Structure formats: structure tokens, C-alpha cells
From Swiss-Prot:
Any one annotated GO CC term: cytosol
Full protein name: Protein GrpE
GO biological process: protein folding
Main location: cytoplasm
Pfam families: GrpE
Primary role: Participates actively in the response to hyperosmotic and heat shock by preventing the aggregation of stress-denatured proteins, in association with DnaK and GrpE. It is the nucleotide exchange factor for DnaK and may function as a thermosensor. Unfolded proteins bind initially to DnaJ; upon interaction with the DnaJ-bound protein, DnaK hydrolyzes its bound ATP, resulting in the formation of a stable complex. GrpE releases ADP from DnaK; ATP binding to DnaK triggers the release of the substrate protein, thus completing the reaction cycle.
Known partners and oligomeric status: Homodimer.
Keywords: Chaperone, Cytoplasm, Stress response
Amino acid sequence: MADEQTVDTQNPEANQAPEASGDDLATRVQVLEEQLAAAQDQSLRVAADLQNVRRRAEQDVEKAHKFALEKFAGDLLPIVDSLERGLELSSPDDESIRPMREGIELTLKMFHDTLTRYQLVAVSPQEGEPFNAVEHQAMAMQESADLEPNSILKVFQKGYQLNGRLLRPAMVVVSKAPAPVSPSIDEKA
């Protein structure tokens, strides 16, 4: 009778040819190690990218929270300006408007306290201070013999910063050097 071959249907690898040689196994191990190293490197890169995306998202949310008040605060500034202007134009000696003036002062103080609480800081340059193009907006230039050129002569309107970012520049008049006096016709003769 012919020899019967038994075929193991449960383990197909058992039916394969005899084991590969040592060189083939070493090559196979090296290839697998390289694939493993590449997969680990790819995994580290994906983890780093994920961490960068997470950090960027956190920064974006932080900025959104920090500057969410920007438009609202900008809309409130004209109200603060009007209250300040009302105080400047009213006489502190006039008894008939004293209660109104006190009310404006209290309201303005509440506004200033609230603005400070939300990191809104006034940019109010003083006369003689050097002009700073980042924080100031020159509305006019005027000759002045008393001040250095590019110094602030007058402040029309205070500026404001929100969390260190300029919300509105201070509007100012800037000094310039006086024009040289040319001799008159009589002096030339």
C-alpha cells in the first residue's frame, strides 16, 4: 500500500518546507527590527504632533478668553470719555449741579474700577512726554519753542490697552520745531 501522508489542516505552517536557513532568519529579524524602529519613530512623531495641536488649541482658547471683551470694551470707551468730558466741562463750584457732578464722579469711578478688573488700562500721556507711535496717534502738529520736537503738547483723548494689547491709541497734538524766522525786507537793507 502506498504511504499515506497526513496533512495537518489546523496548522498550515507545519505543511511548509523545512525551516529557512540561519542567514534568512537573520535577514528577516533585521527587516522586522527596522520596521519596528520605523513604527516607533512614527508613533513618537504622531504623539508630538498631537501634543502640539493640543497646545495650540489651548493657546487659542486662552487668547479667545483674554480678548473676548475687546469689542465690548471698545464700545464702552466712548461712554467713559463722555462722562470724563462732562466732569471737565462742569464747574465744581456750581452748587446747582453738585449732586449731578457727584453722581457722574461715582459712575465714572465704578467704570474705572470695572475696566481695571478686566485688565483694561488707560494710556494717558502727559504733556512733554515723547511721542510714541505705538501708543499715540498724532492728530495735529504744532510749533513749540518750549518743548522738544516730537513731544506731546496736548491730549485730545486717552487711549486704552486690553491685556497689554492696544485697544485704542491716545489722540494727541505733537510739537515740532519752530520755523526759522526769515529776515524781513527792512532787515535786509
